[in-house]
Amino acid sequence: MSLKNPATDTGVDDVVDRDVSLLSEDDIYLFSEGSHFRLYDKLGAHIITVDGREGTVFGVWAPNAEKVSVIGDFNGWDDHRHELTPRGDSGIWEGFIAGVGRSMPYKYVIQSAYDNLRLEKADPFAAHGEVPPKTASVIWDLSYDWGDEKWMTSRAQNQKPEAPMSIYEVHLGSWMRVLEENNRSLSYRELARKLTDYLLEMGYTHVEFMPVMEHPFFGSWGYQSLGYFSPTSRYGIPQDFMHLIDTLHQNGIGVILDWVPSHFPVDGHGIGNFDGTHLYEHADDRKGFHPDWKSYIFNYGRNEIRNFLISSSLFWLDKYHVDGFRVDAVASMLYLDYSRKPGEWIPNEFGGNENLEAISFLRRFNEETHKNYPGTITIAEESTAWPMVSRPVFLGGLGFDMKWDMGWMHDTLAYFSKDPVHRSYHHNKLTFRMIYAFHENYVLPLSHYEVVHGKGSLLVKMPGDDLQKFANLRLLFGYMYAQPGKKLVFMGGEFGQWAEWAHDRSLDWHLLESSLHNGLQHWMKDLNHLYRTESAMHESDFSPDGFKWIDCNDAVHSTISLIRRDGQGANELIAVCNFTPVPQHNYRVGAPRSSFWKELLNSDASVYGGSGQGNLGSLEAAPVPFHGMSHSLNLTLPPLSAVFLRPVEDPS
């Protein structure tokens, strides 16, 4: 029966239909057991039709509530009009309200059983939200006509370990702005055209978005997320974000999302203290509050929280067709004493500092992701020496596909920041990585971490005058691409952004009017092309068979030389890097075969802004044994350069 107030008739029923439920007995069983990973189809706000009337069924988990109501414009934000009904002892409250539909803002009012608290909360499962700083959820449907079937069919092949992966890390709000329109960010639909065209031009295989999940504080860059099921409304509606991903897919570009299951902010409308109790976060601050970030930590040992988080990950794979996740701050999850002093943490049941509940959660997350969506990838941002991060769960690993090599990033940038006259004393920073390079499946990141908080841009870190700074940065990228491992570069680095990154301003695209910046960008295009088209550069990124030092010990000349091979060992490339500003003539390196060797790329070429020194396009390996090989090459190494060579039968 529907009762209406004729004085305020909006077409919305005043009575909640308590008999309508999206939950079966199986749903409630799986929910309580911790194995319901499609909760986004059950909880939240879902538009349905009942007895010929369209409306919305609401569902929210609040086990310690005495009463739960839905409020919104449709009832004057009056929490006495639309009360929900508890479903048994599941802790879930539900109800159907006819006449309530798409675009309507809403919140839950939770009357807690503890301390008589009245709490106004956004929906943890909301599909959409108001533009911050407003905090209400918005009823929305997620229908969309996808056109990316070709990509989805071939995705597993495109993302296998042997495939090239060159990732462009992007903050959507600051990649490009419209200065003439009050410095506004681009919308999802504007980005669909501009960003896709740019990625195609540059030759990247993937884009990684810093967190797009709704977040109240723009200055958190998205890393303090609350909308685990909604893309931020700052740039458009959910279908606009789908269009962005669809456009990228139709152009052969994969999409990786930063995902943050490690912590969440304390904002009053969020999931913290949700029903007046510590529902999502651990009740003990020693496990439930992060001292550095001043944020809550999820209670990974609770079944319902595992449901919530794994449902979030599967939601993005299901509804938004994303191709994988880079999981943020994994180290903070693994260690109970992370960033804590003695006495500020609780040992596990065996007396250790390992967070056993978080480890179990991460393994289950990876298992469910790969089982439900084969061909998708997970990447751990893990900064310690925790073993087997990127090894399968059945072998005792955490189950990630890859892990960021944070040590490489730190050592490499420390080396490059030194004046070349001192580099010979720090040569091990270039070579140490190969001791552990194949213990995990690594991504080599030059990420946003290194261009914020006063660290300066990549270009500013480089020593010397402007010409040398650009030469050093071209060399850095060349050295990076010569190393085994997938590649990631943060936006702006590819053309030599001078300014440190700021989330509220655009990249300085006008710099490309300069030949040096334009030349650096051209170098990155050609590096990506080489990496993608030469099997030796990517097929064995995770195998020691694909890498061999020619000479890693020439610290006197600050020079390294190496061989990259493909999976069959049939295709080989030589890379030689000179980390000094002095050209080195008649520099001999061993060669694995007799043939002509074509100079594929040379970072000192004039087209990139270099001095134009090199090896005249190709040279022949001489039958002069060197470096344990039967033949050798007598090279000219330009200053601050990376040179790539490939054997060819016909030097022309």
Summary of predicted features, one role per range:
Residues 1-57, 87-169, 174-183, 190, ...:
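The feature marks proteins involved in alpha-glucan
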Residues 60, 108, 170, 199, ...:
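Conserved, mostly hydrophobic/aromatic
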Residues 61-68, 592-594:
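Short proline/glycine-enriched turn/loop motifs at strand-loop junctions of beta-rich domains
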Residues 80-88:
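Short, surface-exposed loop motifs enriched in S/T, G, D/E and P with embedded aromatic residues
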Residues 102-106, 616-652:
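C-terminal beta-strand-rich structural cap/linker in extracellular carbohydrate-active enzymes
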Residues 130, 149-162, 171-354, 619:
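Substrate-binding/active-site clefts of carbohydrate-active enzymes
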Residues 132, 321-323, 338-504, 532-604, ...:
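Conserved alpha/beta catalytic core and glycan-binding cleft of carbohydrate-active enzymes
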Residues 516-537:
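Catalytic cores of secreted or luminal carbohydrate-active enzymes
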